[in-house]
Structure formats: C-alpha cells, structure tokens
Amino acid sequence: MDDKIALTSNDGERPRMKKDWRFWTIFAALMLIAFLAALDMTMISTALPAIVAALPPSSIAANWITSAFLLPMVASQPIFGGLSCSLGRKNSVISALVIFLVGSIVCATAKSVLVLVVGRGVQGLGGGGIHALSEIIMSDLTTLRERGVYFGLIALVFAVAGFIAPVLGGVFSHSSWPWIFWINLPIGAVALVLLVLFLNIRVPLLTGRQKWEKLDLVGNAILFGSVTAVLIAVTEGGIKYRWSDARVWVPLVVGLIGLVAFLMVEWIPGPLCRQPVFPRDLFANRTAAVAYLQTFLHGVIFYGIIYMVPIYFQAIKDRTPLQSAIWSFPLTAPSTPLALIAGLLISISGRYKKLIFIGWALMAGGVGWLTHWSVGTSKAEWAISQIIAGAGIGIMFPITLPPIQASLPVERLEAATAAYAFSRTFGAVWGITGATTIFATQAAKKLRPDYGQLEPLGLNDFTVIAFAESLRYLPEQLQVLVKKVYADAISDSFWLFVPLAIIGFASTFLLKDLPLPDFIKSQAVLEEKGASENASPPESLA
C-alpha cells in the first residue's frame, strides 16, 4: 500500500499538515461540490417566474420549487454528520454528490411543476450532505488557526455562487431553463472523479451497533418530520390558504411541538438516542450557542435578501431576470472579497470578535436601508444600500464556525460542524419562505379588491411571485397600482431582517474571543505517503 495513516494523539490533536498536491486536489473537489450546492440554492430565484410560466399550470404554489430543495437540505445535514462517522467521509460525500446529480437530472427533464418539485427534493437531500461534509472534511485537514483561510475560500465559493447564480438563472430562463440543472452534471462529474481517486480519510473504528447509534435514526426522523410540517405551514400560509385555516396552523403547531420533542429526545438520556446528532453540550457552551444563533440569523438574512432583491428589480424597475441579476451585483460583489479577507484576518490574528461586530453593524445598516426601497428609489440609493448589506454578509460568512470549534471538544467535531451547517441552512428556510410569504401575503391582501381586473390577466393569489416579470405588460393604470403594492410588500419583507441583524450585533457581546490554536482538532486523518502500515491502531478506511 502506498498511502497510510499518520498516528494521531489520544485527544485528536495533531500538528499542521503539509499542504501537498493531494490536499489541494481534495480541496478543489470540495470547492466544486460546495459551489454546486450553493448555486442551486440561489440560481432558481431569478428564473422562477420564467420556469413557472414555461410549465403547465399547476395548483402547486411556485415557492414549493424553492422549499422542496431547502427542506431535505436542512433535515439531511445532521444525518450526514452521523454517516461520516459510520460509513466514513469518502463514502458519505460521494453518496451525497451522486444523490444531488440524480436530482439534477430529474429537474432538468421535468415536464410539470410536480416532477420539478420532486427533483428539487432529491437535489436538496444530496445538497445537505455536500454542505455538511465539505466543512467536516476541511476541519479534518486544517488547524483552527489556518481554518479561517480555507473556510474563507469555501465562503468565497458561496459568495461567488450568490454573485453569478442570479446571472446564470437569468441567462438560462431566456434560453432553456433546464440548463439550470444540466450544468451540474459536468462539474459534479469532475468533482466525483477527484474524490474517488484522492480522498482517503480514516475515521476511528466503530462496532456495528455504534454505527447505527451514530445515525440517531429516531432523532433524525423526528427532526425531518418536524421541519417538513413547519415548512408546509409557512409555504402554504397566506398564499394557498389563510393563516387561520387548519391546513396551515395544524402542521405549524405539530412541527413546533415536534422540534421541542426532538430536543427532548436529544438532550434527555434514554434508550431512544444513545448518540445524539444534536448533543446538549453543543449549546451548553455560551460561545458556541451564540455562534450557532448568529449562523442561523446570517442564513435568514442572506438567503432572504438574495431572493427578494431580484424580484424588486423585475417587478418595480421592469428588468428582465438577467438584468435584475446584474442590478443585484452591488449586493453580491462585496461578499466575495470580504469573505476571503475576513478569513485571512482570522488566520493572521487568531481572533474573530471584532470582525463579527463589524459584520453585524454593516448588515444592520444595509438591511435597514433596504426597507426604504420604493417605486421611486434612485440607482445610487439601491446600489449603496446593497453594497453596505453585502459587505456585512460577506464578512460574516467564514467567522462563526471558528468560535464553535474552538470552544468544543474534539470528539464533537462532526456533530458541531453538522449543526453549524444545519443552522445556516435552517436559517435559509426561514429567510426565503418568511420573506416570500410576507411579500406574497401582503401583495395579495392589497390586490384582492382589484382581482376582477387582474385575474383575467393572470394575476391572483397563486401567481403573485411568478407574475413579477410580467408587471411591465399591464395597462399603464393597473401597472401603477400594482407596482405600488409590490414595492410596499417587498419593503415589508425586508423589515423581517432588521431586528434579526440587531439581535446578531447585540449577541456578539456574549461571545468570548477565544484563541485559535495552530493544531488540527480531529480524530479523522488523511492518509499520508511514507507512513508505516502499522503506524496506527486498527481503524476503518473510508
């Protein structure tokens, strides 16, 4: 055998590893798959009206095309955290990538909204694994100090995806929307080959029973069902059914009760859960708990804004999907360099608290300005407000994981990192569904008295979001009325994020600015050439 494992200390701490060509090959593959998952979270936003218009009419609300991706993406992340211990990093990440690519094929070949929603669900299942495992594997290979750089680069991937995804969505919506999904196949194939050939990480040996316990089947089943129920409620509420309808509040109540039951199963010792995916001690540490909260809030704000801004430009400024993506550049462009700069500063200084303060301050100021957008907002105003918000969003991308991992023991690496990925994506669920629901609910409420004129033109409760691209074709008198309603509703949706940004800033006072040591904290080790075959205790290769 030409590749063997290096011996690790009992506490899972090892010196910084040499960054040879194999490390960079693995890192490139992880960046590719992270790019795919991030791309499909946001590319659909600008293309959604065109996709819905191209498919046969359906009673399924358009925002289910988004929600169907987010639901399994959120719920699968803790599952893949457990799988990474039971099946190993390699088998788990390859499985996630294959599932994602299969979902992409289903979406690309869909001839109805129903099939597209199913395909998006399969995509989301794989995307959740990709999101969690890329960060777990990078934590296996880097020290806490240098992790800021590499997570800054991964954050850079998410920022770049947020930057170009709306553009690609706009381009494909005008030519052939299935290419939004076909484009994943060649990129995913390259990453798959690299991972199969070069990713060889050993994890501590587990017995068959321990592997099953690591999966936490009961806890994950409760979590999946609870998230599903909540998402059904927030997706249908105010759009397909009134909030007072039992078909909305019953699943909402059941889902919230289920989330409480999930935490009870996870945190109270018992036979149902021997190896919780969300162990209580992750949140018993104040610094880790605050960092998880901030990760969640960042996900709410970032993904909510990136979905609503293109809708504003399409509906109010008469932009095409492609043009609306270009006009969103001031929001996404600052995120790209600032995510990397923030990661570099953390690696140089070993500190993160001041950067977190700066990130939240910029985000709160920028988001607060967005709430003033109206029909008459000038180019300078919408550009500068996006730049400020985007700067804060970019700074926050790489800097909430280091305090989590620095404050928790090494044996919690997989659970801590999967919970981090879950927190951001769960935030995305609430950000996207919350913002679009507020927008659609407020717009529909104000437009109902005029549905007699609008419904024959295709605008009703079910088409409020999809109709954004078509407002410019309305008769002038109706266009003025509807644009005013849409602008007010979009402003209402932005107000969701203002108190959350303020909470994020205030919670930073509770963080401890822990030092980030320059050693690797992980019980899993990348095989290195030249090591003796018996250099370590028997472990499973995956």
UniProtKB/Swiss-Prot annotation:
Q: What is its main location?
A: membrane
Q: Does the keyword Membrane apply?
A: yes
Q: What is its biological role?
A: Glycosyltransferase; part of the gene cluster that mediates the biosynthesis of mannosylerythritol lipids (MELs), surface-active substances that enhance the availability of water-insoluble substrates. MMF1 is directly involved in the secretiopn of MALs.
Query: How is it placed in the membrane, per its record?
Result: Multi-pass membrane protein
**Does the entry feature the keyword DNA damage, yes or no?**
no
Instruction: List the glycosylation sites.
Output: 285
Applied biotechnology: MELs not only have high potential as eco-friendly biosurfactants due to their excellent surface activity, but also have attracted considerable recent interest because of thei runique properties, including self-assembly, anti-tumor and cell differentiation induction activities, and moisturizing and hair-repairing properties.
User: What organism is this sequence from?
Assistant: Pseudozyma antarctica (strain T-34) (Yeast)
Q: Cellular location of this protein?
A: Cell membrane
Concerning InterPro entries, the annotation shows: MFS, MFS_dom, MFS_trans_sf
Domain of life where this protein originates: Eukaryota
Could you list the residue ranges that cross the membrane?
24-44, 51-71, 98-118, 124-144, 151-171, 179-199, 215-235, 248-268, 296-316, 326-346, 355-375, 384-404, 419-439, 490-510
Its induction note reads: Expression is induced when cells are grown in cultures containing vegetable oil as the carbon source.
Which keywords does this chain's UniProt record carry? Cell membrane, Glycoprotein, Membrane, Transmembrane, Transmembrane helix, Transport
GO terms assigned for molecular function = transmembrane transporter activity
Query: Which protein are we looking at?
Result: MFS-type efflux pump MMF1
Concerning SUPFAM superfamilies, the annotation shows: MFS general substrate transporter (SSF103473)
Kindly list the GO CC terms recorded for this protein. plasma membrane
Sequence similarity: Belongs to the major facilitator superfamily.
